[in-house]
Amino acid sequence: MGYISNNNLINYLPLSTTQPPLLLTHCDINGNDHHQLITASSGEHDIDERKNNIPAAATLRWNPTPEQITTLEELYRSGTRTPTTEQIQQIASKLRKYGRIEGKNVFYWFQNHKARERLKRRRREGGAIIKPHKDVKDSSSGGHRVDQTKLCPSFPHTNRPQPQHELDPASYNKDNNANNEDHGTTEESDQRASEVGKYATWRNLVTWSITQQPEEINIDENVNGEEEETRDNRTLNLFPVREYQEKTGRLIEKTKACNYCYYYEFMPLKN
């Protein structure tokens, strides 16, 4: 009695190259069991059908074609800035022959185009206000010098000749170094002369103050005990007068008496 070896048993068994089918069991309302056999190939087919059922418009953006852009720009240049709902539908229906487009795409294109035009206009106006500095070529140095625009107006009384050291600093420094040696000896003599002049002026002021008589000042004491300083009013004496003072207590009264010897009286003429 012979036995079949394991190797011979494996050779007799058929080999399956496909995946085993899946058996799904579900129960309905009546309680009956239903069996459904699903294979791997049928599952892949169901996935492909689900992908095809997804709408393409929900996943794609609007990519305008050159023909659509050209048509929209022509409409904008012709005067269309904010189209109405009917105009948007008409424009979209005309542009669909060049590619996919919707009404909202037309509306947003006009809005964005107007915003870009406003931004460009503001940049041009801002560039016109702010002007760059002019580069003026300097013939003496051979380079360029930047001249800044004057913001304040010039007045006639402020226009004065510019000093030489401001016009040409190099030449002024050379002349200044040469003149310092010549003026070195004269500075001491000028200083001595100024001191002598100051001393003479001071001596004249002292002499003048001594020779001048101080003005007579009357100090009267009022009822409240306050002191007032009053000075004599200087008047032009047309006729010679004689002055005398009368002292009465603390008060000093000055009176002026007229000299009647020099008094003249003019009488009217008789016809």
Swiss-Prot record:
Q: Which residues bind DNA?
A: 57-121
Keyword Protein transport tagged: no
**What segment(s) does the record annotate as region Disordered?**
118-195
What domain of life does the UniProt record list for this protein's source? Eukaryota
Stretches of Basic and acidic residues bias are at 132-148, 180-195
Q: Enumerate the Gene Ontology biological process terms.
A: cell differentiation; cell division; embryo sac morphogenesis; floral organ development; leaf development; leaf morphogenesis; petal morphogenesis; plant ovule morphogenesis
Task: List the InterPro entries.
Answer: HD, Homeodomain-like_sf, WUSCHEL-like
Localization per Swiss-Prot or TrEMBL: Nucleus
Q: State which tissues express it.
A: Highly expressed in developing ovules. Present in developing primordia and differentiating organs but absent in mature organs.
Q: According to the UniProt entry, where is the signal peptide?
A: none
Would you tell me the Gene Ontology cellular component terms? nucleus; primary endosperm nucleus
Q: What is its main location?
A: nucleus
Pfam families in UniProt: Homeodomain (PF00046)
A molecular function annotated in GO for this UniProt entry is: DNA binding
Key word Transcription present in the record? yes
- Which protein family is named in the record? Belongs to the WUS homeobox family.
Described by its record, this protein's role is as follows: Transcription factor that plays a central role in ovule patterning by regulating cell proliferation of the maternal integuments and differentiation of the maegaspore mother cell (MCC). Involved in AGAMOUS (AG) repression in leaves.
State the protein's name.
WUSCHEL-related homeobox 6
Native species of this protein? Arabidopsis thaliana (Mouse-ear cress)
Cite the source lineage.
Eukaryota, Viridiplantae, Streptophyta, Embryophyta, Tracheophyta
